[in-house]
């Protein structure tokens, strides 16, 4: 059985100089929950992270390649890879494999470089778009609705974290395949922070 994290909820949003990523922690294999503490936000560098939704093996391959691309760029160019360039390289991998064995993934790449904070959405076809906010996974209709209703470009960092949390926790309450708590990552000027909010607190806040 191929393990999947497509039945999930991940969100990302940009506010000022920060990007906030959030995801639930449950992973499924068919109708079964096989893990309740999965990290669906993978650190690529100290200034970039990738959320994953899709087949676990495919997502892990993309994450490892993204890390390699970022390290290679830093060695060759002597500085951090621009987030747009990293998104383009990841989308190229997706599109190259599309004709042979496509990666079953949806990805959100969030990060900060010399141009500021940014968020990119990529699908299995290799298409890439820059977004102010986005959601992926089975809980995305609920999460996106929350983001669309409440997002503002001038949100404070705390407001942005709360909105990301509310988007995922709302999806957890309505989507049987999302759950087990919320991971939140914040990337900003000199900052890469991670925190986990347990399921009990998630339910109490809803």
UniProtKB/Swiss-Prot annotation:
A cellular-component GO term for this protein: cytoplasm
Primary enzyme class: hydrolase
Propeptide residues per the UniProt entry: 1-7
Principal location: cytoplasm
GO molecular function terms listed in the Swiss-Prot or TrEMBL record: threonine-type endopeptidase activity
Region forming the signal peptide: none
Catalytic residues, chain numbering: 8
Catalysed reaction, written as an equation: Cleavage of peptide bonds with very broad specificity
Activity regulation field: The formation of the proteasomal ATPase PAN-20S proteasome complex, via the docking of the C-termini of PAN into the intersubunit pockets in the alpha-rings, triggers opening of the gate for substrate entry. Interconversion between the open-gate and close-gate conformations leads to a dynamic regulation of the 20S proteasome proteolysis activity.
Protein EC: 3.4.25.1
Any matching Pfam family: Proteasome
UniProt keyword annotation of Protease present: yes
GO terms under biological process: proteasomal protein catabolic process
HAMAP family: Proteasome_B_A (MF_02113_A)
Record's subunit section: The 20S proteasome core is composed of 14 alpha and 14 beta subunits that assemble into four stacked heptameric rings, resulting in a barrel-shaped structure. The two inner rings, each composed of seven catalytic beta subunits, are sandwiched by two outer rings, each composed of seven alpha subunits. The catalytic chamber with the active sites is on the inside of the barrel. Has a gated structure, the ends of the cylinder being occluded by the N-termini of the alpha-subunits. Is capped at one or both ends by the proteasome regulatory ATPase, PAN.
UniProt record similarity statement: Belongs to the peptidase T1B family.
Protein name in the entry: Proteasome subunit beta 2
Organism: Desulfurococcus amylolyticus (strain DSM 18924 / JCM 16383 / VKM B-2413 / 1221n) (Desulfurococcus kamchatkensis)
Designated gene of the protein: psmB2
């Amino acid at each position: 059985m191929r393990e999947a994290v497509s039945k999930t909820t991940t969100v990302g949003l940009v506010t000022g100089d920060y990007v906030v990523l959030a995801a639930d922690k449950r992973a499924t294999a068919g109708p079964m929950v096989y893990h309740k503490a999965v990290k669906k936000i993978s650190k690529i560098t100290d200034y970039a992270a990738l959320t994953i939704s899709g087949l676990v093996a495919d997502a892990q391959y993309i994450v490892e390649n993204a890390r390699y691309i970022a390290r290679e760029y830093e060695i060759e160019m002597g500085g951090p890879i621009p987030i747009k360039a990293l998104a383009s390289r990841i989308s190229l991998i997706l599109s190259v494999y599309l004709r042979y064995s496509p990666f079953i993934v949806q990805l959100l790449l969030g990060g900060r470089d010399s141009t500021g904070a940014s968020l990119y959405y990529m699908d299995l076809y290799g298409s890439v778009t820059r977004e102010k906010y986005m959601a992926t996974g089975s809980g995305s209709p609920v999460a996106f609705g929350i983001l669309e209703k409440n997002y503002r470009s001038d949100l404070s960092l705390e407001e942005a974290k709360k909105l990301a949390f509310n988007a995922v926790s709302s999806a957890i309450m309505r989507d049987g395949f999302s759950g087990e708590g919320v991971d939140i990552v914040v990337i900003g000027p000199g900052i890469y922070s991670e925190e986990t909010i347990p399921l009990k607190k998630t339910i109490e806040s809803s």
